[in-house]
Amino acid sequence: MKVFYDADIKLDALKSKTIAVIGYGSQGRAQSLNMKDSGLNVVVGLRKNGASWENAKNDGHEVLTIEEASKKADIIHILIPDELQAEVYESQIKPYLTEGKTLSFSHGFNIHYGFIIPPKGVNVVLVAPKSPGKMVRKTYEEGFGVPGLICIEVDATNTAFETVSAMAKGIGLSRAGVIQTTFREETETDLFGEQAVLCGGVTELIKAGFETLVEAGYSPEMAYFETCHELKLIVDLIYQKGFKNMWHDVSNTAEYGGLTRRSRIVTADSKAAMKEILKEIQDGRFTKEFVLENQAKMAHLKAMRRLEGELQIEEVGSKLRKMCGLEKDE
């Protein structure tokens, strides 16, 4: 595994280039501001007078329509949601994607699964911070950065590495370290992590633990503290020190109980389910399902969101977060 740092990368490859960041959500804002503050020439491409138009202007950006930005830019960095990218690409970006330009992403979904097929003569790269946008910006402003990934799918100009690594440096990623990988590896591992562990697995584990305690007669408030609130403390220890030192920092009771009981929670069946989830990602079944969901205007997803918001743990959690000063009334 090759890791690149600031000293390994020069920004010179981008000094005479214009980078169009398409989208101004969490990542779009953070990445565009960081590159701008690194001295790079950045424009932001958005829907005319859309919700983010004024936000980007107020942040000091030159804001253009997506078509105008794509025409002007040497590098087009697409940071709108996965499900919108192909349609926007075909109608507003592709006509201006001339030979020698670079098409860039922060997630490989649409390239890996073939929803976007760039023309010949165009570099296709990926630069992905391994952190939410707010932390990408916060750590940059503090003089550091978050780790990131770079990938090269097509090197049409023989300068794709210089381009994508300089983008990573401009965003601040090489301050912490940038790993080179592939579109396939980034896409499939990212989807798996979200579904099986980080978003899907963890929330289901928390919910099951909370419900077990409440159903046994314990107060919802105590159940929330013990199964959800304190999770951050443990995750922070793992994040900073790894498993071994996390076990060292908790009590002997917690260490013994956790080590002797954990395999009864995440069982061989759980791992078999993870392998099936990974297969669905690898063979495209998940992608087809998600595309159909998007075509149905996210009806199932919206229903799941509503049900999730009605869970008892959400009501109790909101009350306790306000008590702790972590959440404010909207």
From Swiss-Prot:
Pfam short name (any one): KARI_N
Positions that bind Mg(2+) 2: D190, E226, E230
EC top class named in words: oxidoreductase
Molecular function GO terms recorded: ketol-acid reductoisomerase activity; magnesium ion binding; NADP binding
Gene Ontology biological process terms from the UniProt entry: isoleucine biosynthetic process; L-valine biosynthetic process
Catalytic activity entry: (2R)-2,3-dihydroxy-3-methylbutanoate + NADP(+) = (2S)-2-acetolactate + NADPH + H(+); (2R,3R)-2,3-dihydroxy-3-methylpentanoate + NADP(+) = (S)-2-ethyl-2-hydroxy-3-oxobutanoate + NADPH + H(+)
EC nos: 1.1.1.86
Presence of the UniProt keyword NADP in the record: yes
Residues noted as binding Mg(2+) 1 in the record, renumbered to the chain: D190, E194
UniProt-listed InterPro entries: 6-PGluconate_DH-like_C_sf (IPR008927), KARI (IPR013023), KARI_C (IPR000506), KARI_N (IPR013116), KARI_prok (IPR014359), NAD(P)-bd_dom_sf (IPR036291)
Co-factor(s): Mg(2+)
Domain (KARI C-terminal knotted) ranges: 182-327
UniProt key word Magnesium: yes
Residues that, per the record, bind NADP(+): Y24, G25, S26, Q27, R47, S52, D82, E83, L84, Q85, G133
Cofactor note: Binds 2 magnesium ions per subunit.
Domain of life: Archaea
Pathway the protein takes part in: Amino-acid biosynthesis; L-isoleucine biosynthesis; L-isoleucine from 2-oxobutanoate: step 2/4; Amino-acid biosynthesis; L-valine biosynthesis; L-valine from pyruvate: step 2/4
Domain KARI N-terminal Rossmann: 1-181
Gene3D superfamilies listed in its UniProt record: 6.10.240.10, NAD(P)-binding Rossmann-like Domain (3.40.50.720)
PROSITE patterns from the UniProt entry: KARI_C, KARI_N
Active site residues of this protein: H107
Family of the protein in this entry: Belongs to the ketol-acid reductoisomerase family.
Classification via NCBIfam families: ilvC, PRK05479.1, PRK13403.1
Role: Involved in the biosynthesis of branched-chain amino acids (BCAA). Catalyzes an alkyl-migration followed by a ketol-acid reduction of (S)-2-acetolactate (S2AL) to yield (R)-2,3-dihydroxy-isovalerate. In the isomerase reaction, S2AL is rearranged via a Mg-dependent methyl migration to produce 3-hydroxy-3-methyl-2-ketobutyrate (HMKB). In the reductase reaction, this 2-ketoacid undergoes a metal-dependent reduction by NADPH to yield (R)-2,3-dihydroxy-isovalerate.
Protein's recorded name: Ketol-acid reductoisomerase (NADP(+))
Natural source organism: Methanococcus vannielii (strain ATCC 35089 / DSM 1224 / JCM 13029 / OCM 148 / SB)
